[in-house]
């Protein structure tokens, strides 16, 4: 061992080297786990291991990295935003005051706060000439990149470039901000609070030549400074927050705002003609006014637009949508100076192209009152390119909404005649009015198909009952009028794909309320033929392109089809549906049993009706199916009543049959129960007679009879309980109480006879309704001192028998023999002592001590067997002795049968095998011992044979310890008996030692 100081120095040197290798000594102390140190060595084992501590430190470091990364990203975003503002302002050039005036005007007119306050957006009377704007492209970049007061947080960053080579910069500059945003392809809500549309007059040259009407404003000398820019950016953020809060408050307070009006209106959608000349005049509906943030598939819109541009069709059926205030009357005639505009070709081209932009995405499916997009992706108002063809109202989601929609839209059809006359009839009027909002044929066909068809007098009230959408029917595809209701809601009737079928319709100038049922059916079929790839299951998915909707959607779709019937039959339909549902609920579980009972005529009526509906839906289009449903519903109350009567009759018959079967089963069970009770009573009477006859006999016979009576009554109780359980299971709410229950009450709480000693109360075992009425013996009579003495006598007899058997075992015989031998030796030793005259040698004294020890050990062994051992150990001694006796008997039988001749080893083994087989047949235990004991006998008989020596070693090593010890004891007892005078003490001492260990060996 080295010195302690040397050990400490070495440990300190190792610690210092480790700390120097990682860095300095102090960080090593800081990173170390233990706080208690001795010369720099940690002496306290840490609670945390080094790996766990490192893991915790890594997790902390990760969290800190994430936090620092977030802060760096925020700072970077702010810096990039400020840098963009700086770069954009540095690009701007301001040669004169008119630029700043124009920029201020554009900023004001693009501010949604002005439009939210119901201020009509107006175009300035004069626009600057192109000569004053030599850098037109740069100016457009500036106006597109300036921080405009939008409704969303994102600043528009699109660069507006000329979309066509023939377009000059002056023409684009002369447009208002609304037309420029429409050119960029955004489906923007322009002035939703104002009833007018922003229009650019066609007298363009005059306005271009009059720049003097602009108000002259002196330029701000600090417009280029950095502090001013930072101040403006802060003000911009504050304005965004204030405008958002203002917009939310306006939504809650004002009922006349744009969101309430637009939620009742449909989407304006026009067809695109790419190469049309810019001269024709039509309604400008470039603003897409969504009802809810739900989007039909944009691919269909793009395909429809491209097909329209390639086909070059001139006659297009289109409705346009005009936002009217709630109390304002619709315009009587179009005003060419204010309500119409010249739409160039590049405007429509760019609007179609902008559908493929990055903002043509699905909106959030959350419902909202406002038509603006959710702030999941914050966008500016100019970037709102979401197109909605058929908005989903809240009344579509509940069947009650249809009835409310009838009351809400009933006055809509009254003004359609006056409104339809105010529109020019030329088919070329609509060619220039081509925006990117191309309507899909699915919406038109579905809206026309699901329009309520009733009697002519009720058609005006039923108009628009299609889930709250104000649906009107176009009169002709070639005339191209629009029909507006009092809320300004209009619906596109057909698109470019539906034109060939719409030409086949008969034009008429009548209102929808005066149309006949056949015209509406023809219009339905034509609209349905135009519906190419849209099936019925896709109707609910108004916002998404779902080819395989979930079963829940299809289930609600079928319920919608069933509810699409005229309100005239509403009461009858509800009555029939309610009655059908009640009967179906009651008889759902009875249909199978009715089929088994050969009553198929009841089920066939409902099945036939379902099959008829399926066949009608397969053979005819949906329009004809609706008409047939209307015809069928006229006769449905009678059929429903007949079906209800037949089902109720069948139900009554089945109920009667079940009652009869139930009563029959109950009668059988009652009879069987009575038979069992009579049999039990007979058995009890017989037992009582037997007990009366045996009452004169001795007490032992009384005890036996009581026990027998107890057993019999217990078995009778078990039988009654089993029969009671069977009767309760088979009777099935029979309503009667079996008399077997009465037998179980008196004996339910009784205990078996081996628990009698724990019962001290004298409970009378009397059964309540026994016919004999005789009370049983009390517990005090059965459990008396005499019976106690008899039980004690039984146990004493058993103990005496077992004690005698123990005394007869070989083990106790050996112990008794040892005690007898040692006592004789001690007596002989004491008798010989006077002859030697008191002179005792040391050898004799030690011999006497050993004999006394052997005697003491034998006496202790006997005492342990009878007073210390458990009963199980004593029984094991008896069991072992019984097995030894059987083996001894077998050996004696073999000796008597086999001749006394010398046998070879092979012959002896074969004989042993035969003996083993015989023992196995007899079922004797300890076969291994018997098989191994025979060679030992052979060795004893023939000690000169050397081949038997390994067998003896096996016996001494693997034989049972009981037999080996027994053999040793026997061999030592024989010389002790023969050599008592001279050498008996030595053998006796050894025998005593083995006998002291003997009980432990025998009880293993």
From Swiss-Prot:
Locate the coiled-coil region(s) and give their ranges. 51-90, 641-699
Task: Write the protein's name.
Answer: Centriolar coiled-coil protein of 110 kDa
GO (cellular component) term, any one: centriole
Q: Which GO terms describe its biological process?
A: centriole replication; centrosome duplication; ciliary basal body organization; negative regulation of cilium assembly; positive regulation of cilium assembly; regulation of cytokinesis
| Modifications after synthesis and translation | Phosphorylated by CDKs. Ubiquitinated by the SCF(CCNF) during G2 phase, leading to its degradation by the proteasome and preventing centrosome reduplication. Deubiquitinated by USP33 in S and G2/M phase, leading to stabilize CCP110 during the period which centrioles duplicate and elongate. Ubiquitinated by the EDVP complex, leading to its degradation.
> For bias kind Low complexity, which ranges apply?
243-252
Q: Which region ranges are annotated with the description CEP97 binding?
A: 1-221
Source organism per entry reads Mus musculus (Mouse)
> Which region ranges are annotated with the description Disordered?
147-194, 239-279, 401-433, 955-1004
On whether NADP is a keyword of this UniProt record, the answer is: no
Query: What's in the keyword line of the UniProt record?
Result: Cell projection, Cilium, Cilium biogenesis/degradation, Coiled coil, Cytoplasm, Cytoskeleton, Phosphoprotein, Ubl conjugation
Q: Which residues does the record list as Phosphoserine (modified residue)?
A: 170, 364, 370, 398, 550
Region spans: Required for interaction with CEP290: 67-82
What domain of life does the native source organism fall in? Eukaryota
């Amino acid at each position: 061992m080295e010195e302690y100081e040397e050990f400490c120095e070495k440990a300190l040197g190792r610690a210092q080297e480790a700390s120097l290798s990682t860095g300095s000594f102090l960080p090593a102390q800081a990173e170390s786990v233990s706080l208690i140190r001795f010369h720099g060595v940690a002496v306290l084992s840490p609670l945390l291991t080094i790996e766990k501590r490192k893991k915790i430190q890594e997790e902390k470091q990760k969290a800190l990295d994430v936090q620092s990364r977030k802060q760096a990203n925020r700072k970077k975003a702010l810096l990039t935003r400020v840098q963009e503002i700086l770069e954009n302002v540095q690009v701007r050039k301001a040669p004169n005051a008119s630029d700043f005036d124009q920029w201020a005007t554009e900023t004001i007119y693009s501010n949604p706060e002005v439009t939210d306050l119901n201020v009509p957006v107006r175009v300035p009377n004069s626009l600057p000439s192109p000569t004053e704007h030599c850098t037109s492209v740069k100016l457009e970049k500036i106006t597109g990149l300036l921080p405009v007061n939008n409704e969303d947080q994102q600043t528009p960053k699109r660069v507006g470039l000329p979309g066509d080579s023939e377009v000059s910069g002056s023409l684009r500059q002369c447009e208002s901000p609304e037309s420029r945003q429409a050119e960029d392809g955004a489906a923007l809500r322009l002035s939703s609070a104002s009833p007018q549309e922003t229009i650019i007059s066609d007298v363009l040259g005059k306005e271009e030549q009059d720049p003097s009407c602009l108000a002259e404003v002196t330029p701000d000398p600090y417009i280029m400074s950095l502090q001013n820019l930072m101040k403006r950016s802060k003000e911009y953020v504050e304005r965004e927050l204030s405008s958002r809060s203002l917009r939310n408050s306006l939504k809650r307070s004002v009922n006349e705002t744009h969101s309430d009006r637009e939620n009742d209106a449909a989407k304006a959608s026009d067809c695109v003609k790419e190469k049309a000349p810019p001269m024709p005049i039509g309604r400008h509906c470039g603003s897409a006014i969504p009802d809810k943030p739900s989007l039909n598939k944009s691919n269909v819109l793009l395909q429809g637009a491209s097909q329209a541009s390639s086909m070059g069709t001139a006659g297009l059926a289109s409705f346009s949508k005009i936002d009217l205030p709630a109390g304002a009357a619709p315009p009587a005639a179009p005003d060419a100076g204010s309500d119409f505009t010249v739409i160039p070709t590049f405007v429509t081209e760019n609007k179609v192209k902008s559908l493929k932009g990055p903002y043509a995405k699905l909106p959030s499916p959350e419902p909202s009152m406002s038509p603006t997009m959710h702030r999941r992706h914050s966008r500016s108002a100019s970037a709102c390119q979401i197109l909605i063809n058929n908005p989903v109202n809240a009344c579509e989601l509940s069947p009650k909404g249809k009835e409310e929609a009838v009351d809400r839209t009933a006055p809509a059809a009254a003004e359609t005649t006056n409104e339809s006359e105010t529109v020019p009839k030329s088919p070329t009027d609509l060619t220039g009015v081509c925006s990117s909002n191309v309507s899909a044929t699915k919406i038109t066909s579905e809206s026309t198909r699901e329009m309520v068809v009733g009697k002519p007098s009720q058609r005006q009230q039923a108009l628009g009952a299609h889930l709250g959408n104000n649906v009107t029917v176009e009169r002709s595809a070639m005339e191209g009028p629009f029909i507006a209701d009092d809320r300004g809601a209009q619906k596109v009737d057909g698109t470019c794909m539906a034109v060939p079928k719409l030409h086949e319709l008969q034009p008429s100038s009548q209102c929808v309320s005066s149309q006949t049922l056949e015209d509406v059916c023809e219009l339905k079929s034509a609209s349905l033929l135009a519906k190419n790839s849209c099936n019925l299951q896709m109707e609910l998915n108004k916002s998404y392109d779902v080819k395989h909707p979930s079963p829940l959607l299809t289930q609600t779709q079928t319920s919608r089809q069933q509810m699409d019937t005229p309100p005239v039959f509403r009461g009858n339909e509800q009555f029939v549906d309610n009655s059908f549902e009640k009967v179906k609920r009651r008889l759902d579980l009875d249909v199978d049993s009715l089929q088994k009972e050969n009553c198929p005529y009841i089920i066939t009526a409902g099945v036939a009706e379902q099959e008829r509906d399926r066949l009608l839906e397969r053979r005819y289009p949906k329009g004809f199916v609706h008409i047939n449903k209307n015809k069928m519903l006229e006769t449905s109350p009678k059929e429903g009543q007949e079906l209800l009567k037949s089902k109720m009759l069948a139900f009554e018959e089945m109920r009667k049959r079940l009652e009869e079967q139930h009563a029959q089963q109950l009668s059988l069970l009652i009879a069987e129960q009575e038979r069992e009770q009579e049999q039990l009573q007979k058995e009890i009477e017989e037992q009582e007679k037997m007990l009366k006859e045996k009452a004169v006999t001795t007490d032992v016979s009384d005890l036996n009879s009581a026990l027998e009576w107890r057993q019999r009554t217990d078995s009778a109780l078990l039988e009654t309980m089993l029969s009671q359980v069977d009767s309760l299971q088979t009777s099935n709410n029979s309503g009667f109480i079996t008399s077997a229950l009465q037998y179980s009450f008196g004996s339910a709480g009784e205990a078996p006879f081996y628990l009698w000693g724990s019962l001290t109360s004298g409970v009378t075992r009397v059964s309540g309704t026994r016919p004999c009425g005789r009370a049983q013996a009390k517990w005090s009579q059965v459990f008396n001192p005499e019976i106690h003495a008899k039980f004690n006598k039984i146990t004493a007899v058993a103990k005496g028998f077992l004690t005698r058997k123990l005394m007869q075992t070989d083990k106790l015989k050996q112990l008794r023999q040892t005690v007898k031998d040692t006592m004789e030796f001690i007596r002989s030793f004491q008798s010989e002592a006077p002859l030697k005259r008191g002179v005792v040698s040391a050898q004799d004294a030690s011999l006497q001590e050993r004999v006394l020890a052997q005697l003491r050990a034998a006496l202790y062994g006997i005492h342990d067997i009878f007073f210390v051992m458990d009963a199980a150990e004593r029984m094991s001694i008896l069991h072992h002795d019984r097995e030894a006796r059987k083996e001894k008997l077998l050996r004696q039988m073999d000796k008597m049968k086999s001749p006394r001749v010398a046998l070879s080893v092979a012959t002896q083994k074969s004989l042993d095998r035969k003996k083993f087989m015989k023992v196995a047949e007899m079922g004797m235990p300890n076969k291994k011992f018997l098989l191994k004991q025979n060679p030992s006998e052979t060795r004893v008989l023939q000690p000169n044979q050397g081949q038997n020596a390994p067998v003896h070693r096996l016996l001494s090593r693997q034989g049972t310890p009981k037999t080996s010890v027994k053999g040793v004891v026997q061999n030592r007892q024989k010389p002790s008996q023969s050599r008592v005078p001279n050498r008996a003490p030595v053998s006796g001492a050894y025998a005593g030692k083995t006998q002291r260990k003997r009980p432990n060996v025998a009880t293993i």
